[in-house]
Regions:
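Acidic-enriched and Gly/Ser
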Residues: 1-142
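A near-ubiquitous, low-amplitude feature marking generic local secondary-structure context
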Residues: 4, 12, 84, 133-136, ...
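P-loop NTPase nucleotide-binding/switch module
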Residues: 80-82, 89, 96, 109-158, ...
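P-loop NTPase catalytic core
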Residues: 149-150, 156-334
């Protein structure tokens, strides 16, 4: 009981920073008043539904605070009150995550009940000194002969799969999750259709793969903020298990949809479109995500694998940027 007290104190609010909504245009919300920093979580009072809508501070413009919500903007009105929690997005961490499916806000969606968490990790990409990352020396066994025999992968290595739709990427992910010689798998499904999520869990992953996996899901019908946060939350959870001394395999499907969500956010807050409509922030955020998790100096190795859905024959600027992030390996498929 007493060990929970420091966490409760840290999450308590002693000062309230309150503003009000000025403009709502599409996904972008502008508020005035109060104090805020980039990344702060705010709660917007929804009078229509008598509830609070969570949002995040993503920018500032003309003296106003720009917000993006984690939920629908339905019911948010001009003049609605906004309260800054002075907190960042945090996810509950612990062994209770094994075999569970959560959304990009860290909330369970599998119907198995809420978490009783006493520890939280902040979702944030922190720069790591490259000299603290030892070279890759140890082989990781995937339990798949075609990979272990012809495409040997080391612990801490990053692998990208560049392929079009319908070639069996999800099937391969399920095979890897069931057979890989790691302690736990963390899988991020970004922008998937709802039907595909259930099919992946039941058909591709199966009971054997699910019991030692954690799924972080943000479907295509959810706001761009959740889709953008999905791989970051998965990375944070993977870092937790790595810190506990476990070997972890992190898989993401897909980086393209992560970049598309980042593009939606960038365009909504006024970033200029550049190559193929992508905004400059994408080319700053992609390297942070790709380089976020590797082998630590004192931690167990973390095998890192990303999935990028683009045909190799039509590789454009985004694909080239991702390829540069996968300097250690890439798989291609038609």
């Amino acid at each position: 009981m007493y060990e929970k007290i420091p966490g409760l104190i840290n999450r308590s609010e002693t000062v309230a920073y309150v503003g009000k909504i000025e403009n709502v245009v599409g996904m972008s919300i502008e508020a005035s008043g109060g104090r805020a920093s980039i990344g702060d979580l705010v709660m917007i009072y929804n009078e229509e539904q008598n509830s609070q809508t969570p949002a995040e501070v993503v920018g500032f413009k003309d003296g106003k605070v720009q917000l993006m919500t984690y939920e629908s903007t339905s019911g948010i009105a001009s003049g609605s009150f906004v309260r800054n929690t002075r907190q960042r997005l945090k996810v509950p961490v612990g062994d209770f995550l094994r075999g569970r499916i959560i959304n990009a806000a860290g909330e369970p969606i599998d119907g198995k009940g809420p978490f009783e968490a006493s520890r939280y990790y902040t979702v944030n990409s922190v720069y790591t000194n490259p000299l603290n990352r030892p070279p890759i020396r140890e082989k990781l066994e995937f339990g798949i002969k075609a990979i272990d025999g012809l495409n040997t992968i080391g612990k801490g290595q990053r692998i990208g799969i560049f392929a079009g739709s319908g070639v069996g990427k999800s099937t391969l992910m399920g095979m890897i999750a069931r057979n890989v010689k790691t302690d736990i798998n963390v899988i991020a499904l970004v922008g998937e259709r709802g039907r595909e999520v259930l099919e992946f869990v039941e058909k591709d992953l199966g009971e054997e793969g699910m019991k030692r996996s954690v799924l972080v899901v943000a479907t295509s019908d959810q706001p761009a903020m959740l889709r953008m946060k999905c791989p970051l939350v998965a990375t944070t959870i993977a870092e937790y298990f790595r810190d506990q001394g476990h070997d972890v395999l992190l898989m993401m499907d897909s980086l393209t949809r992560y970049a598309m969500a980042q593009r939606e956010i960038g365009l909504a807050i006024g970033e200029p479109p550049i190559a193929r409509g992508y905004t400059p922030s994408i080319y700053a955020e992609l390297p942070k995500l790709l380089d976020a998790v590797q082998k630590g100096l004192f931690e167990k190795a973390l095998a890192f694998r990303n999935e990028h859905v683009k045909t190799v024959t039509n590789m454009e600027e985004l694909g080239e940027a991702v390829q540069n992030g996968f300097a250690l390996g890439m798989w291609c498929g038609d």
